[in-house]
Amino acid sequence: AKLWRELAELPTVFVPPLHAREGLEKYNLRIARELSLDGPYPMHSVWTTPRGAFGKTLLLELQRGCARSCSYCTLPQCFGRMRFRKFEAVEKAVDDITARFDIPQAGLVTPEAGDYPFIAPLLAKLREKEIGVSFASLRLDRLTPDMITATSESGRRSVTVAPETGSDGLRFACGKKFTNDLVVEKLAMARGLGIDKAKLYFMVGLPGETDEDVSAITALCRRIIDETGLALTLSVNPFVPKPRTPWSAENFAEVRTIKGKYEKIKKEMRSITKKTPQLRLTGVKEAEAEFRLAWYGYKESAALAAAVENGETRLPEGDRARAAEEIARFI
């Protein structure tokens, strides 16, 4: 197809139907190094429609990249250093769009909205235009009263945050340098500004994790409920090591190990009788599929399809190392 051929000419794009026919090795693919956001690239949705995944929400990009290096996260490697849209450009875009269209809500696209240096004046601008706000990501240690107020004024009574673990030490090892005290403090602030529910993301199977670390998830949830009165929903997911991250060489936990941690959490959560948290546990097979997709290259896809068809669930010995070598050729 014409589109495939045109895309294949770009040095940072891999088009399997074309490239794989002659072998990936002969293509010198590289990661794009465009760092500036001041170029002629769209910063917002071209159009909105109630039939789309985000409905009438206008997606507004503020930032790319990240200054942190969380041990499990691919974002710094994928998007490079942190850089921001100029506030004047974002403000002009909001003015131009609202002059022509009725925009009920803006979705702020950014790795972490609290890192955007102009988040306060932007929220004030959107409030002035009577535009609701939704955040793609909220990091607890960057959460501000303005952000919570914007959330509640938009009609939402829930926030989503990711403590990752109930243990301060293990959270620090993950790269999130904040304590349980701060988690409770920020959620108490949210409660005082009109929020009554919180969704918390946790991981199990982290490197160095102990039974005490797993139990700490329940202990933290109990403390949040006791001190804030929030209703909690927990999303608990197995740790999946990803290429090009500090923890890329760590093991993906065995199925029985993950299931054992899940059972421990379910049992201990039942001991919370006051506003017992709702538990959502990511399926182990789903996490395994994520692991394989992260590590398999094009060459391994046929083996993956056969393994799935045969009911196999683990990455065959040696494939992960070969995938790492193949990924290195893109760098």
Residue ranges with predicted function:
Residues A1-E88, R329:
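Acidic, low-complexity intrinsically disordered segments
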Residues T48-G52, K56-R64, R68, P76-F87, ...:
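Hydrophobic alpha-helical scaffolding
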Residues F14, S36, S45-T49, T57-G65, ...:
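Structured core elements
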Residues E91-T233, P241:
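Conserved SAM/AdoMet-binding glycine-rich loop
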Residues F252-K266, E300-E309:
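Acidic, Ser/Thr-rich peripheral helices and adjacent loops at domain boundaries
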